[in-house]
């Protein structure tokens, strides 16, 4: 293992130990297969960060409601990017919106993702995985190894499809063309890295995408978003223009 990778593995060792303990609990205590144990780890992770996911959804809804004002500022100050950014940040501040809150669930999942990656590549866990005689899951022959051939194609289709659908559901119908292009392009961007990962990591990521899709469906039914503001409501939220300066007349 390269020195940089070894340093990162040592940094995440406490989380790797936790992930290992969770997988062993699901497999040895409950009696699930290793594939279902990884799915259980995914569900547990997503349940723990559910408050962050709710905050993410609220932030994205608030950003969506502010889009008319944002577009107006972008058009008004299209030749002055510094003023444009300043005015946009002022709108976020006035409405208590953090434009970066939508990234929190992904940021908190990355340590778990990396911990699972290092765990599946470790010799100790691979011995544990193969000792029970069930290293595979469904059509996947070995969760600790990267897949090839038609299995790889199926996994990539599942990964890309669930990533795109989950991303588009998260951004909603009000997403800009640029946001939609990003959601479509991200799976392609990560594909060269994904194909070299153990297949268990792909199981984790596909499962978290499915969780996102289900989570959004539940929230949409039980907590529907507020209707978009009318032009009159948008106009009412804008501060009144400053009064014109009185001209000094020389008597």
Segment roles from a protein language model:
Residues 1-251:
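Helix-loop-helix
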